[in-house]
Amino acid sequence: GTCAGKYVLQAYVNPPKGRMAKPATALVGFAKTRLLEPGESETLTIAFAPYAFAAYDDEGVIQKSAYVLEKGEYRFCLGENVRETADVAYRYALESDVILAQLSEKCAPKQLHRRMLADGSYRVLSCAPETPREDWRKLEGIPDEGQYPLEIPDQIPGCAWIPPIKPQLIEVANGELTLEEWMSLLSDEDMVRLLGGQPNRGVANTFGFGNLPTYGVPNVMTADGPAGLRIKPECGVTTTAFPCATLLACTWNTGIVREIGAAGAREVHENGVGVWLTPAINIHRTPLCGRNFEYYSEDPLVAGEMAAAMVEGIQSEGVGASLKHFACNNKETNRKDSDSRVSERALREIYLKGFEICVKKAQPLTVMSSYNLLNGLWASQNRELLTDILRGEWGFEGMVTTDWYTHAPQYTEIAAGNDVKMGCGDPAHTLKMMREGKLSREDVKTSVKRLLEMILKLA
């Protein structure tokens, strides 16, 4: 043509038809040119590993609880979109089945007994043992008796500042003390208070982390959201409204998304906020989901790559990103008590894949667990999700928070690897559970350490 423009190149794989059902065509990579003048060209490179198109075997067809490549011919195509690909660019014949990663069963469903196949027939699924109704109360950690009100730290009338009387966190930052040495001075009460959200200050309206003044732990503020920094409207401070996540994904341009992340993070930093509650990365499963505008795509690869770019941009400015909502938060109606029932294969290949890509590529400082139940257990108290998969399999190094005001008891969340309860914790009940032996001090200490490590990484 006669106009300058950019071109998107997409790579697809056509896997062989084997014993495991697979998509006929799957996106495995993409790239976008710079702005090209008429007649100008650019060479693009798209790289991907076999893991990108491996299938997860949750039935034991080839190897149970493993990512596998079935034997047969894999055809790779390039094009502008899935409907307009050129002839097969490359063929590879795999002579035998390959086990790429041997894992173990996690987050298996209890009430999904059949899987529909391409021909309309069904295959029986293995399910985790269903929890008897009489055990639900124990599983969900519902307190046996009494009410446990939130304890607010005592305020000193007329005193705006408390002189430091304890070793300060800045001494850890300066290398005068190790974090372990400093933490050894904290009481159980100190640690439990740190694991709940803290009051707003400044322009923030989504609460903060930390806030232990006698030890010099700052109250690090958070702020929404995926379309730009959102602060108290009465403050009179204007911020930029960036294009929504879905529109950003339509660009296929991770470079632009990275720049937007950095620009937004500068606004976050200027307004005294430490953690920006973005990106949101749940799958576009249905057009009826009330948060689709905050989510990138129906394709987990696109969602994961866009989120990774956003996190890289945000954290390049010394601001923490919060990857959310982990996981399967695909509806807003009754979102705090709805149960997302999904097979382990669909969970790993679709609903967790974007999170996996983002965590492995960009290491967000925080991950936010979701409100909903996942196969019968609240995500915020699901140890297989938050510890075994997120940290054990993917190598996540940061802190996990709940979404705001989840229904699960805080002590069960801490034990699962959910470090901080937002927008506030339940210190009295959590401390009671520690003293009764239902929550270990080691689990509490681990969560506090993750919180403090996150604070020390902020600019």
Regions found by a protein language model. Give the residues of each.
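Glycoside hydrolase catalytic-domain context in secreted enzymes
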Residues: 1-84, 105-459
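Short beta-strand elements
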Residues: 84-107
